[in-house]
Every structure is written in C-alpha cells, then in structure tokens.
Amino acid sequence: MLTDELIQTVRNAVDERRIVETARALVDIPSPTRSAGEVADKLAEILSQDGFEVERPETDWPEAPAVVTRVDSGADGRTLQFDGHLDTVHLPFSASDIVDGNLTGSGASDMKGGVAAFVEALRILRDGQLPKAGSVLMTAHDHHEGPW
C-alpha cells in the first residue's frame, strides 16, 4: 500500500546527481539502431558495479542486444516491468551536456535519461527492501528506432 510516508521516503532517497551521471554515461555513447552494443555493455557494467545481477539474453537479433535485471522481494506477487530502449534516431551524434539545467545529447530524453531513472528506481527499491511482494524487472534493448 502506498502511504504518504512511503512516498516521501522514496522521494528523499532519489539521488539526482547519480541519475545524471548514469544518464550522461549512456548518452555519451553513440547508439543508432542496430548499433547499441557498446551502450548496452555500459549499462550492464553500471548495474553490475552497483551489485545487480545482470542477464544478457541471447536473441534472434544479435545486432539488438538486451540488458535485464530485477529486484525480487522473494515473496509471490506481481511483476512490474520497466522497459526502455538504448538506440537513438539516426541523426548526427551529440554528446551529453547540461544546458540551462537540462541534460541534452543523443537519446537524453528518448530514452537514455528514462533508463537512468529506471536504474535509480531499482537502487532505491533494493536499498529500501522494496517491494514487499513480487518483483520489479528492468529490460533495456536496441531496435526501437527502426526505419519501418
């Protein structure tokens, strides 16, 4: 049950600096569709270094790598999935920058910044021993910004 106290506890746990660092690490790696292997490797490295067990599932699309991790309560319950893509549109690459307090760069808002927010949410859930039932699954992959 979401109580006002729980919501405030989660808000207080958010480390904006860490989200920006994670997002910049992802944004600074060019990753046009079908070429997101390096950024997927970086995300897996970030998660592993932070103590998460990372899966790299084999797929029928080897040019579209995926990264999977989860926070599991150990108790039966539903699974909430955070899903995001790591590839970017085929425009000239732009490295990360902070402009007027906003993160810019290739994929900053679609969707590497969102993936960084997922990572922070997983950290908070794990460190707060949440959820109490079920699990939270995070998947990140290539092949979203396809030409079709």
Question: Each PLM stretch: what is its role?
Answer:
Residues 111-112, 116-148:
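Acidic/histidine-rich catalytic neighborhood of metal-dependent amide-processing enzymes
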Residues 2-108, 127-132:
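Acidic/His- and Gly-rich active-site-bordering loop/insert found
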